[in-house]
Amino acid sequence: MSALDTAPAGSLAETHAQRGTRAVAFWLWSLAVLVFLMVVLGGATRLTESGLSITEWKPISGALPPLSAEAWQAEFENYKRIPQYAALFPDMDLAGFKFIFFFEWSHRLLGRLIGVATALPLLFFWLRGRLPEGYRLKLLGLLALGGLQGFVGWWMVKSGLSDRVEVAQERLAIHLILASLTFCFIVWLAASLRKRPREISPSKASGLAWGAGLILLAILVQIGLGALVAGLRAGRAYNTWPLIEGNFLPPVESLTLLTPLWRNFVDNLLTVQFQHRMVAYLVLGLTLLQVFWTSGTLGSGRATKRAIALLGLVLAQVILGILTLVLVVPLWAGLLHQAFAMLVLGMAVAHLQALSQGR
């Protein structure tokens, strides 16, 4: 007689539930990796000026690239009709077009894959009754977020097809922030499935979680500001550090050159880069304070180690940002900078989630 035959029914049910939870957690962490890759591939698409190479949105038929010489030429002719071609790539041949096309096509294909990798396992776990309590609506919300991101991506691309030679930087920022929020949501859901005993009293955990939440908010703002920098190509200007145009704090008249005033925060290259620099210092300072606060409150426990790890990632990201700036945004540096932004974000979410559970 096996151990399973003699085990109490309640114990068997508990084991089945634990296995289901582990499977759901593995699925969610896998989705987080896919979204991470999606953001990095999106960065490569932007840095190679590939984002406008596909001028139509075909959610189903667009999953396949052109399969004949005639189809490739037709796609190329479509691209030649938009302003970017004449302004940036008037000498591009078909081989060059195929290069940028495959970046954008791969980005969209990965988006479709993420949609399938979300919907099918969700349906499977739902029908098998293996979703943890309270997760059904949350996961439906995640699926809706993915669909919304597809629409926002096309809305962003449309902004560069008629009167501009690039996508609107504010739409790029919305696209990246929505991807970042989706990533945050997945990491939070996955991390929440790891149950451990409470180690921190509710009063101490609440205060520390408030600080961690402020850090997370600052990181999200910084990611949005980074998208504005990328959309304006502001990283290719003012390529000195720590001074910008010979000053740590640029003249107010230079920062407020455009009218109305709000336009400077999204259209003024100097202002956009300056605010990205300043918020980087803010994130670094808040993270350093979190380390002192956590270690002073809890000693050298698990939460302090997480805070130190987050500080290390933030410091590495600041150094990468400086290198990206002074080297005038080489592809490798731009991609590493974007990848590290998501690593910082994921660590910040995991830290906040653990504190919310008293760990």
From Swiss-Prot:
Keyword list, A-Z: Cell membrane, Heme biosynthesis, Iron, Membrane, Metal-binding, Oxidoreductase, Transmembrane, Transmembrane helix
Class in the EC hierarchy, top level: oxidoreductase
Transmembrane segments: 23-43, 85-105, 109-129, 137-157, 172-192, 212-232, 278-298, 308-328, 329-349
Binding-site positions, heme: 276, 337
GO BP annotations, alphabetical order: heme A biosynthetic process
Membrane topology category: Multi-pass membrane protein
Localization per record: Cell membrane
InterPro entries, sorted: COX15/CtaA_fam, HemeA_Synthase_type2
Pathway of action: Porphyrin-containing compound metabolism; heme A biosynthesis; heme A from heme O: step 1/1
Entry GO terms, CC: plasma membrane
GO molecular function: metal ion binding; oxidoreductase activity, acting on NAD(P)H, heme protein as acceptor
Cofactors (names): heme b
Catalytic activity as recorded in UniProt: Fe(II)-heme o + 2 A + H2O = Fe(II)-heme a + 2 AH2
Listed EC numbers: 1.17.99.9
Coiled-coil regions listed in the entry: none
Function description: Catalyzes the conversion of heme O to heme A by two successive hydroxylations of the methyl group at C8. The first hydroxylation forms heme I, the second hydroxylation results in an unstable dihydroxymethyl group, which spontaneously dehydrates, resulting in the formyl group of heme A.
Similarity comment: family membership: Belongs to the COX15/CtaA family. Type 2 subfamily.
Subunit description: Interacts with CtaB.
Protein name: Heme A synthase
Species annotation: Beijerinckia indica subsp. indica (strain ATCC 9039 / DSM 1715 / NCIMB 8712)
UniProt lineage: Bacteria, Pseudomonadati, Pseudomonadota, Alphaproteobacteria, Hyphomicrobiales
